[in-house]
Structure formats: C-alpha cells, structure tokens
Amino acid sequence: MYLKYLIGTLFSFSLVFGMLSASQSDFVSILLWLVPVNVGYFLLLYLSKNDRSVSFYLFIAVVIRISLVFTTPNLSDDYFRFFWDGNVSIQGKNPYDKRPSELITSSVIERDHYLFRHLNSPEYHSVYPPFLQYLFKYSVKMGNNRLDIDLLILKVFYALFSIGMVFLLPVILKLYDLKPWRAMIYLLNPLVLIEEMGNLHAEGIMVFFLALFFLFLKKFP
C-alpha cells in the first residue's frame, strides 16, 4: 500500500531536482539522472495498472508540473529565442519578417543584445506559430523586462495546458472505454515532463488541442 507513495515521492523529487541541476553538456550526469527516473516511471505504471484508483498518480502529475514551473531550462537554450520573438512583437515589429542577425544591427536596446548573444539560431527566421508568438509577447510584456519573470510567466502559461491534460486525458480514456491508468503513460512520462515543462517545448500544447479534438469527436460525432 505504501510502496506507491514511496516510489511516487522519490520519482517526483528525482525528476524536479535533477532538472534544477542538469547540464546540457554533461552526458554522464544526465544518464545517471534519467536511468533511475525512468525505472521509477515504469514502476509507477505497473502500480497504477494494479491500483483501484489513479487519484494519487494524477496528484503526482500535477505536483511535478507545478514544481517544474520554478526551474530553469538547463537542457535547452531555445527559450532565448522565445523571448527574442516576444521582444520583437512588443516593439511593434513582425517576428517573422526579419532574422535576428538583421534586426540586431539597428537595435540600441541592451536587452536585445543580451538575448541575441544567447540565440542558437540568429540566422534563421522564427519557426514558432502565431499562437505561441502571443504567449511569448505577453510573457515579455507582463515580465517588465526581467528575464526571470518572463520565464516564470511563460511557464505558467504552459502549465495551464499541461495540467489541463491531467484532467482531460482520463475523461477521454473513459469515453473510449480504455482503462484510466493508461493516462499515466503520458502524464508521468519523464521525456514529456522534461521537454514540456522543463525545456518549454510546445509539443505539449499541441497535444492538448489534439486531445480536445478526440474529446469533441466522441461527444459530438
């Protein structure tokens, strides 16, 4: 009975604290972190499959997502481009119009130069869709030129969709006569958690809207 609480707690702490200390260039440390985390993940899948209720596992999924809001994306530097695009938007410019390397030559704004130095794709046009551009723009606008606040606000936006999936996925599985424990395959998946809430990659938002599609498909055939 208490095994799930022990494994769930260890899994949550390991994933979150590993994200806090992870380094993109240290492969060995990442491997030593992810191996036990994935072992914990598969143990939780096994336990949830044989448990009468999945409430505890859903609780873990929410707690981890909230905790990851307060971490820095140590395994990806893509977020600098997010805030570059947001910065361009609040200056009244089109983030798709010019490449960062073209815009920086005429900018005297210190924040622009700071973000530009951290970009991994200064020679490329933005690839992020309009919906994400709005999230980037309002994160920067609400953050008042503080990168740490921008990051926190954007993570809160992402968390709304991610936590939405925690509530949405079990409902969808029930509509399709599938066991609720199967939701944990996605909701507790370390790769999903790290990429979606840790590194701020937007695939989780797309999955949320895909899930809505399947919900409406069943509700309104």
Question: Which sequence ranges carry the predicted segments?
Answer:
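Short hydrophobic alpha-helices at membrane interfaces in multi-pass membrane enzymes
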Residues: 2-4, 180-183, 214-221
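Specific aromatic-rich, kink-prone transmembrane helix
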Residues: 168, 205-221
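Membrane-water interface at transmembrane helix exits
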Residues: 20, 45, 136, 140, ...
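Transmembrane-helix signature of polytopic, membrane-embedded enzymes
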Residues: 52, 56, 169-190, 220
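Short acidic/glycine- and proline-prone juxtamembrane loop motifs at membrane-interface regions
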Residues: 197-205
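Intramembrane catalytic core of multi-pass membrane enzymes that act on lipidic substrates
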Residues: 54-155
